[in-house]
Amino acid sequence: MNINTASLINFTQSLVRIPSFSIQEKAVVERVIEEMHSLGFDRAWIDEYGSAVGVIEGARSGPTLLLDGHCDTVGAIPADWSHDPFGAEIVGDMMYGRGTADMKGNLAAMIYAAASVDRARLAGRVAVSATVNEELMEGPTLKAIMDVLHPDGVVIGEATRLNLNRGGRGRAEVVIETRGRSAHSSSPQAGLCAIHEMIKVIQAVEGLEVQVDPLLGPGFMVLTDIISDPYPGHSVIANRCRATYDRRLLVGETLQTVLEKIDSCAGLEGVDFSTSVLYGEEKTYTGADLKMSKFYPAWKFAEEHPFVQSALRGLRSAGLSGACARTLCKGCATPAAGPSSPRIKHLGAAAALGVLDKA
């Protein structure tokens, strides 16, 4: 496998220099397609949701391997950065910029790796997808590509320090709503403040036991926002209050078990509250609709799984440690491996050039 490292670095810089916040990925997707054509992919196209897909065909029939990386990023406030988030500046062996680690550097490495495959020796095909909207809604744009390609295995290029992740915690956006009784603030005894009721629920949730998976870690809940109604209050006691939690899921947890655990909290017998999972509705930059419950189950594969073992052998043959750890997809073998560290995916994101080349 011969990779032109200078071209890989230049391509990564070009991706980082194109802002591609969720729902604004059109320009970066077009840049990906341009590079796929330049590198000799047999087919490259943009699907209905706006994701880029490229395919390398082998000389003989065989399984399909899909390499996936999302091309959207979270936002960036330049004042919070020590380097221009869209400058792709190289200092020493590090490239700085939004998306270098999560996950434009990883995506670029996968595109170049696929392009370098010896077609004469390849039985099957290698595909690469640059999916959109992942930061807002995980999964549906990747699933759409899988429904077309029917891959036998998927590798997702998340930041793993080049280890192989064989499992991942799931995630749910849990909404809790409390109900009270409105009254003017001059007569508080006539009302029941939904905010005070929410405080009781929050305290009960904080007291819930956190389950721990030996591979995936803890299945915790984090409060991410809270708002009362009416807002602003204007001297009116709130009759409703809504809080959103980010709940990290472990294998075997379902929507029902997650909500029942909150509903059955001790000490909330007199509190009028309800729980639900947020239903997401988004439009991609092409105008296509994405709709789904924001409940993404956890998953993990045994270390002995044939695809996991095959991936480990590949890492080790490339001179990497091939350590097996945790991290996304349902229905087929889906390990993850990529350059950089999970800790630097967002604020001050950077990627080591040497690690990018190894990826």
Per-range role (PLM):
Residues 1-76, 240-244, 258:
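N-terminal helical capping/dimerization or prosegment-like subdomains
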Residues 3, 177-359:
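Metal-dependent amide/peptide-bond hydrolase catalytic core
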Residues 14, 112-119, 200-206:
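Short glycine/serine- and small hydrophobic-enriched flexible loop segments
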Residues 63-127, 358:
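Active-site metal-coordination/substrate-binding segment of hydrolases
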Residues 68-70, 129-131, 155-158, 177-179, ...:
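Short beta-strand segments
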Residues 76-91, 166-177, 310-314:
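Acidic-glycine-rich active-site phosphate/pyrophosphate-binding loop
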Residues 103-169, 173:
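Acidic/histidine-rich catalytic neighborhood of metal-dependent amide-processing enzymes
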